[in-house]
Amino acid sequence: MAYLKNNFNGNVANPKTLVKIVNKKSKIVINYKAYNSCLFSYSSKNNSELWRGCVCEFFLDLGDDFYYEFEVAPNGATFVAKIKNRVVTFFEQDFFSGSARIEKDNYFVEMVIDLDKIGYNPKYIKYNCFRVEYKPNEKEQNLSALNPTLCGTFHVRDKFLTL
């Protein structure tokens, strides 16, 4: 388990987010504990702009010319897309499940990715974990990352970690 850091400077993030990643038998299981959230979910519709609210995100690079982006909002809405040259392509899939549970001002997310259904090279799996905390009345999003990109976007592939 590890705490996410402030995405801009790498310091301790506030609010705190604890993440645990387990790679077992071709499934990646990611659990987030997102503390002290305003719990603002931008939409209840899957594959909408969930990042405009509070959300936990997981980026997965399997060595292709694209990478996957997975998101789960506090209300359980999910986002699954391929990102290639900063272009988002949504698609129907059966290899991802995401869920969220709220307790007071915290929410807990579980993501499960079945790598066998995607097709992958077990020697090349890269990833990064993120959280967006966004209060609708504030202009700035609070961005945190397992491996901070040190800028205003999470889409920095060379900051992905090896699993």
Specify the residue positions occupied by each region the protein language model found.
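Structural preference for beta-rich elements and adjacent junctions enriched in aromatics
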Residues: 1-163
